[in-house]
Amino acid sequence: MATAWYKQVNPPQRKALFSAWLGYVFDGFDFMMIFYILHIIKADLGITDIQATLIGTVAFIARPIGGGFFGAMADKYGRKPMMMWAIFIYSVGTGLSGIATNLYMLAVCRFIVGLGMSGEYACASTYAVESWPKNLQSKASAFLVSGFSVGNIIAAQIIPQFAEVYGWRNSFFIGLLPVLLVLWIRKSAPESQEWIEDKYKDKSTFLSVFRKPHLSISMIVFLVCFCLFGANWPINGLLPSYLADNGVNTVVISTLMTIAGLGTLTGTIFFGFVGDKIGVKKAFVVGLITSFIFLCPLFFISVKNSSLIGLCLFGLMFTNLGIAGLVPKFIYDYFPTKLRGLGTGLIYNLGATGGMAAPVLATYISGYYGLGVSLFIVTVAFSALLILLVGFDIPGKIYKLSVAK
């Protein structure tokens, strides 16, 4: 009789994943809170819709810098210490957002948040996946990423109402809490055993991901990540504004985004099990194709029908964003240990610029067709391209060619 999967994980491995997961919970909370109060900030600071969209996504500009730096440092000095520093950085950036007095100050603060959150992802994802048994790494990947959804749900439940009573500035001060987590990680969490075993081997330089034999695989992993962010971030970032602009009140928006967060949370964990069962690539394609069932009617339903919108949102996030839980494992398979932090941090976060470009593109298109239709168009386009890339296993074929050379 086969041993249950959870019995194959020892206490240090559980503690490693839990500490990385907590960091990602606060990451999701700190990063997503601005999207729930962006309409309040917009009115208070007197900024335009396109400026508000850019503020909401400026953290993506910082992500390749933060991810590359922290990833490279994690390859050199260890996953755990650099994860601690990354958590500290995004917490400080969030807290400083509360004292911003204009568009430019807020943009700088969000840039700092982007540096920290991208670094946290680079360190935490390699740390979590490396710490678990090979046959359970899709689950480790999914459990880790589910933390972002938990943080998002908490933000959706707390921040809108808190901001209405105490102001949007005080909302950002809550984002300083993760600093306390750093102290616990320093005391309790173990280092990645896989990194410890590999740390005395030759190290790669910062430019190694852009040189043979890694260049081609870096480029295709970048394209996959760019399309993934393009497929799910327009709805994540702009849906609250879409609902608010159509007269939906704050309580209903908070409820709907909580439902969306629950969809992402359960979908992330579900596809972690599916990934270990049928493989990461097949799980990707199944999730994306299924997402069209829920996406197609979403923006053509009356905003007054909140129950049906909630159902579609849950299903869309379960599928379209649920597969994001497999990304750390997906990247893990294409980079060696000595380059994994850098590869994850730099290439994944370069791809994350899709999360900046797609909402801006959707906002631009909305000037012609309305925000609902533009969100639909952009999401379908990026999802279709992602299905083609992963469905035909383009990354796997390129990887085999690069290894063979």
Curated annotation (Swiss-Prot):
Keywords: Cell inner membrane, Cell membrane, Membrane, Transmembrane, Transmembrane helix, Transport. PROSITE patterns: MFS (PS50850). Residues 1-20, 75-80, 124-139, 186-214, 272-282, 329-344, 393-405 are cytoplasmic. Residues 42-53, 102, 161-164, 236-250, 304-307, 366-371 are periplasmic. The keyword Metal-binding does not apply. It is a multi-pass membrane protein. It is found in: Cell inner membrane. InterPro entries: MFS (IPR011701), MFS_dom (IPR020846), MFS_trans_sf (IPR036259). One of its GO terms (biological process) is carboxylic acid transport. One of its GO terms (cellular component) is plasma membrane. Bell et al. show that this transporter allows the growth of E.coli strain BW25113 on 2,7-AN as a sole carbon source. However, Kentache et al. show that it allows the growth of E.coli on 2,7-AN and 2,3-EN, which are produced during the degradation of sialoconjugates by sialidases from other bacteria, provided the repressor NanR has been inactivated. This is Sialic acid transporter NanX. It comes from Escherichia coli (strain K12).
